[in-house]
Amino acid sequence: MLVLCRSVSGKSLPENARIMGETDETDFSPLQIGQQYKVYGVMFYTSRIDFLVSPASGGPMWVSSNLFDVVDDEIPQGWGCVLTERSEGYADLSEAFGIHSICGYLELIRSYSHYVGILERDPEELKIFYSQ
């Protein structure tokens, strides 16, 4: 699955799709307009969908799908999904942020410590991430 970045500005997010304090001034750097990104995961909120992408200069980050156009819509072979409210660890994401489910490579959806590790830039977890 590939997406094309068409904006790095919070202005591109509809009001009802803004979460965690996002505003018009929110800057989604290190994304680059016109750059294609491989999608490593898809996260479903009530009001929006996020893609897990990895800009060359920033590492893995979840970003609203509102900032992208889908270039290749094929879901990668071997992906799975986790329903957050029913899964240990992931239930925290449901309660705290309203995340309903995550789809992605198996380590992402089967290991909450891996999910947290890539966001916290744990070297061992990043090694797994970049092997995808």
Label each PLM-derived region with a short phrase:
Residues 1-22, 83-132:
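SH3-family beta-barrel domains
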Residues 46-52:
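Short aromatic-glycine-enriched beta-strand elements
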